[in-house]
Swiss-Prot record:
Locus of motif Cx2C motif 2: 286-289
Function recorded in the entry: Component of the cytosolic iron-sulfur (Fe-S) protein assembly (CIA) machinery required for the maturation of extramitochondrial Fe-S proteins. Part of an electron transfer chain functioning in an early step of cytosolic Fe-S biogenesis, facilitating the de novo assembly of a [4Fe-4S] cluster on the scaffold complex NUBP1-NUBP2. Electrons are transferred to CIAPIN1 from NADPH via the FAD- and FMN-containing protein NDOR1.
Residue span of region Disordered: 162-190
Organism: Salmo salar
Domains: entry comment: The twin Cx2C motifs are involved in the recognition by the mitochondrial CHCHD4/MIA40-GFER/ERV1 disulfide relay system. The formation of 2 disulfide bonds in the Cx2C motifs through dithiol/disulfide exchange reactions effectively traps the protein in the mitochondrial intermembrane space. The C-terminal domain binds 2 Fe-S clusters but is otherwise mostly in an intrinsically disordered conformation.
Ranges for region Linker: 171-223
Gene3D superfamilies: Vaccinia Virus protein VP39
The protein's name: Anamorsin-B
Keywords from the UniProt entry: 2Fe-2S, 4Fe-4S, Apoptosis, Cytoplasm, Iron, Iron-sulfur, Metal-binding, Mitochondrion, Nucleus
Family under the similarity heading: Belongs to the anamorsin family.
Length: 313
């Protein structure tokens, strides 16, 4: 028991089961009693009556289960949960249980036993040792479970309860407000650079400073207002015999000029009539209209009159 690190003043719950020897159980209890001293306490409990004993929660610093040599009990999930409940936060559980090397319905493997301890709310699950079962424990196990395999071994594991109650809650201080970022420190400016970009009013009257007069940059020709002819490109409407044609992206005004000329030609060549209704058809024509009998036509459309009506009868 020296490897358990049980200290004076600790409260220990010793869980035993059949077919443990009463003499061996008494010796183990007395050994633990000498370790905890008068300020501590050692309580004995049968595994089959653990759930009915109603121990107070978080009472024991240690729970030692099935550590007797002839013990061969299987810890159910309810039993492990009850052991975790009665342990103080930060307390430890040390147990021994027969395991198998292969998957079986009656017995667990060492890995599944570790998972069962973790599911009970315990942490820091560690396998301490593994060894064979005693003949008495093996016989009792085969009788209770019917297991006839040859891969049995006895494993000792330890686990700890977290430093808080399992299922306890605590309010978290969370801040969802927007945090104002701290202004970043601006890099220091080089004094020489800052001086180069600073213009003093006194520098304007310095004789060594040469200021350029903007009016001196323009000559007399630059101040003249250009006429429209000078703005045209040399090849714009080139040639006296060729028809004038504006450029694709004309910006000198030739395109607008040619458009106005074409509109004037169309206006002059459009035929005129006294009544202005000849093109609508016979219903709108005069009795002496030369277009009588002809179909309606569009305004300005060229119409050729037949010369049959001009011959003498």
């Amino acid at each position: 028991m020296a490897d358990l690190d049980v200290k004076a003043g600790d409260k220990v719950l010793l869980v035993w089961s059949q077919p443990s020897s009463p003499t061996t159980l008494k010796e183990l209890a007395e050994s633990l009693g000498s370790m905890v001293g008068s300020e501590g306490r050692v309580s004995l409990e049968n595994m089959e009556r653990l759930l009915m004993s109603s121990h107070a929660a978080s009472t024991y610093d240690w729970v030692l289960s099935s550590l007797l040599p002839d013990s061969s009990s299987i810890h159910t999930s309810e039993t492990l949960a009850e052991m975790a409940r009665v342990i103080k936060p930060g307390g430890k559980l040390v147990l021994e249980e027969p395991v198998t090397g292969t998957n079986d319905q009656q017995l667990r493997t060492a890995e599944k036993l570790m998972s069962a301890l973790k599911l009970s709310g315990l942490v820091s699950v560690t396998e301490i040792s593994k060894g064979p079962l005693t003949p008495k424990a093996l016989s009792a196990l085969r009788t209770s479970t019917g297991f006839q395999g040859n891969t049995l071994s006895r494993v000792r594991m330890s686990a700890s309860k977290p430093n808080f109650e399992v299922g306890s809650s605590s309010q978290l201080k969370l801040s969802f407000g927007k945090k104002t970022p701290k202004p970043e420190d601006k890099p220091a400016l080089d004094p020489n650079v800052e001086k180069a970009w600073t213009l003093s009013a006194n520098d304007m009257d310095d004789d060594d400073v040469d200021l350029v007069d903007s009016d001196a940059l323009l000559d007399a020709d630059d101040l003249k207002k250009p006429d429209a002819a000078s703005l045209k490109a040399p090849s714009c409407g080139d040639g006296t015999t060729k028809k004038k044609k504006a450029c694709k992206n004309c910006s000198c005004g030739l395109a607008e000029e040619l458009e106005q000329e074409s509109k004037g030609v169309q206006t002059i060549s459009q035929p005129k009539s006294a009544c202005g209704s000849c093109y609508l058809g016979d219903a709108f024509r005069c009795a002496s209209c030369p277009y009588l009998g002809m179909p309606a036509f569009k305004p300005g459309e060229k119409v050729v009159l037949a010369n049959t009506g001009l011959n003498d009868a």
